[in-house]
Amino acid sequence: MAKTIKITQTRSAIGRLPKHKATLLGLGLRRIGHTVEREDTPAVRGMVNAVYFMVKVEE
């Protein structure tokens, strides 16, 4: 089974760059406090790194 990470949105997407909003939607995050579980792949890690200041990651 693939390793997974939990990603939680901690800050609002209002007033952010359109590509940051798109990245959050790509991760499946829709609102503050929303948590999703994703596979720990380089693609997902890259998306998290792009919006690191708006999310919290748990291994």
From Swiss-Prot:
Gene Ontology CC: one annotated term: cytosolic large ribosomal subunit
InterPro entries noted in UniProt: Ribo_uL30_ferredoxin-like_sf, Ribosomal_uL30_bac-type, Ribosomal_uL30_CS, Ribosomal_uL30_ferredoxin-like
A Pfam family of this chain: Ribosomal_L30
GO BP of this protein: translation
Listed SUPFAM superfamilies: Ribosomal protein L30p/L7e
GO molecular function: structural constituent of ribosome
Keyword Lipoprotein applies: no
Name of the molecule in the record: Large ribosomal subunit protein uL30
Organism: Enterobacter sp. (strain 638)
